[in-house]
From Swiss-Prot:
GO MF annotation: an example: nucleotide binding
Name of the featured protein: Protein P19
Species this chain originates from: Enterobacteria phage PRD1 (Bacteriophage PRD1)
Keyword line: DNA-binding, Early protein, Nucleotide-binding
Domain of life according to the entry: Viruses
Function summary: Binds to single-stranded DNA (ssDNA).
Amino acid sequence: MEKQTENTRPECPKAFYFVSIPGDFGQTPFASSLMYGSTALAAVYQVKGAIRVVSEHFDLRFADNGFTPAGVTQAEWLGKLITETFGFRLELFL
């Protein structure tokens, strides 16, 4: 297998690539929305200048004990989590 460097992505068909998201995010403000130690594997690809997220590839184990702000859906929370972490503009298809 060819060695990957830090700035390269594995070659995938149709501009399809994977992003591994650690559960703790280095103690970002959004860390508590995912179970600590979990990994969300997202299938992400470019669609019309935005990043489209295929939700079934996410590990959506959100805490239901007040970590997610009142009135904010898990989809919105996940979108903000990824936007803040990666700087992507997201379109979520859940």
